[in-house]
């Protein structure tokens, strides 16, 4: 048996285990943490108690993860504030929320370009004037770029754009809403980061750098606000099937979370207010990188060579990738379920 056969032999059982432990249940909980189900039953903790009577602002609330999370929160009794660029899409989600069985949910819409700091300030002031404050802020909006270093030499704007939306936009929202949270001695800021921050996924340098910047900032801010009962949670989200990943058509063959599963991870974080919410594989990757980064570099390099740049990243007029995954690649993808390569 050569090294390649041995690797493939190991990856197959890993793929089976990965499918089990890296897929959250309907409550947004990864299987190794199911003990929380019992604790919640004993303690009576649920989403209704966490959000009822609370104002919850969600960026990127017009589709995908944000829309799915908004509906869950509204069903549980929270007042949802939806923020995104397109008013029509926001209204569609808001109407779905208002049509919830019973008395319907409460939803407010505020269209805003979240890469424009002045526009964010104006929108935030409107929210404060209309609703008095925000109890839970979910920084979910984001821009992802998958492009190798070789194709990025003349594309500094990729780094600027991702930092503007993923980092500075979220920071502006935090700065606008956290004073009220501190005054009321309650607040929760949930940042939807990426498992890529833990795995250091190749081709995603611009994207994960912007997410890591927000992660580090909020680690520092948490130390300043613990006594104010303001909590920060970083959700290292696995790969989710949303419009954001559609330009990379090879992801059609990757196992992903659904928006509803991802929304469950967020709502579970709202209930428990952990510092970090991560998949088991993401946690393993972070520890492995700390212990032996050289080995992890080789794993990442293998993935880099296994999956090429998309047609969109190459600037091709055709947005269709013709490459197919071979059996080794398929096994590797299943073994690293939820990771964007």
Curated annotation (Swiss-Prot):
Its EC number is 1.-.-.-. Keywords: Oxidoreductase. The keyword Ubl conjugation does not apply. Gene3D superfamilies: NAD(P)-binding Rossmann-like Domain. GO terms for cellular component: membrane; peptidoglycan-based cell wall; plasma membrane. Substrate binds at residue 194. The keyword Ribonucleoprotein does not apply. Belongs to the short-chain dehydrogenases/reductases (SDR) family. This is Uncharacterized oxidoreductase Rv1543. It comes from Mycobacterium tuberculosis (strain ATCC 25618 / H37Rv).
